[in-house]
């Protein structure tokens, strides 16, 4: 299944700015997550296509098209332009596995949604071109409401691995615990490790030897 | 299936202290979530049993036993004491649905685990009495490792609804978006509502009229 993966190669994961040494390192992290998402999509039988807000500066193992419009606009255009069904999977789902993505591909409904934590929407599968797309605000609720208003059937996939987008430092704990691809290794190579601080897991960085 | 729900009636959800007016209101919130979890367990075909750290001060729709030991100790004892299989479901899983809990009950394996966000473990299903239990630190990783060392088969249920424990104010957004039982109504009755602040969903409180 055609699977669009929106990606911001310029200033990705800005809420993690303090966690990384500089923007270039932060971009490296974003590219590692992107590679994992593309691999999981492909292993699930999907054909990933990256829709980037700017030309990519590193190798990406999928066709890349550039669309510098807002996320919702670019995604709606990608759905309208392409063959159906089309899935849309966020580029920061570092916990995504082929099994989790297969559950999306296999779900019925005009629209299949996987919620993201914090009211968001991390995966949209569109089986018709007129699926309303809006990632602003409480997007999961809005996607459900808009799709039902349009007379479309909606199915939800209840997946932690698809809900856990990596937005802030606390999310990195789950990357360490649950990622089995490149992102975890990338963090380890950079000197990060999982620690427990007063009973609470956290990710800390130690100088490389 | 016998389902143990550990509950702290004295100082629950202490990380939400600043969100509520006082400890009594915070307890009210915890009891609302507990009621939702018990309802979801029962609707999934489970028989809930509350294991509380102290006597409960409000009506609870399930048998209550008091065990004031540490969480891991009390849960291990509850598994060892009771008929098998026994499931253990955290009391703050306000997003839990019967469907999500049924997936746990239906999963095979000596041990079935549902991860909690941040490295935790939110559901344990034990089919043997010697399932190692430790909620400290990176408990999901530790549960998997300890069970495999003990020669037990481990199955994981990938569920956002079971991963999303309610620990801090940002988690309340998901209660508003995804809870369909008592907790959301409890928040609304208390004057809280979902708002969008600069594109980011948040939960705010407004004075009651």
Curated annotation (Swiss-Prot), chains A, B:
EC number: 2.7.7.68
Reaction catalysed by this enzyme: (2S)-2-phospholactate + GTP + H(+) = (2S)-lactyl-2-diphospho-5'-guanosine + diphosphate
Keyword hit for Cell inner membrane: no
SUPFAM superfamilies: Nucleotide-diphospho-sugar transferases
Pathway: Cofactor biosynthesis; coenzyme F420 biosynthesis
Pfam families assigned: CofC (PF01983)
Record carries keyword Nucleotidyltransferase: yes
Name of the top EC class for this enzyme: transferase
GO biological process: F420-0 metabolic process
InterPro entries associated with the record: CofC, Nucleotide-diphossugar_trans
Keywords assigned by UniProt, alphabetized: GTP-binding, Nucleotide-binding, Nucleotidyltransferase, Transferase
One function term, GO molecular function aspect: phospholactate guanylyltransferase activity
Function: Guanylyltransferase that catalyzes the activation of (2S)-2-phospholactate (2-PL) as (2S)-lactyl-2-diphospho-5'-guanosine, via the condensation of 2-PL with GTP. It is involved in the biosynthesis of coenzyme F420, a hydride carrier cofactor.
Assigned protein family: Belongs to the CofC family.
Assembly description: Homodimer.
Identification of the protein by name: 2-phospho-L-lactate guanylyltransferase
Lineage of producing organism: Archaea, Methanobacteriati, Methanobacteriota, Stenosarchaea group, Halobacteria
Gene that this polypeptide is encoded by: cofC
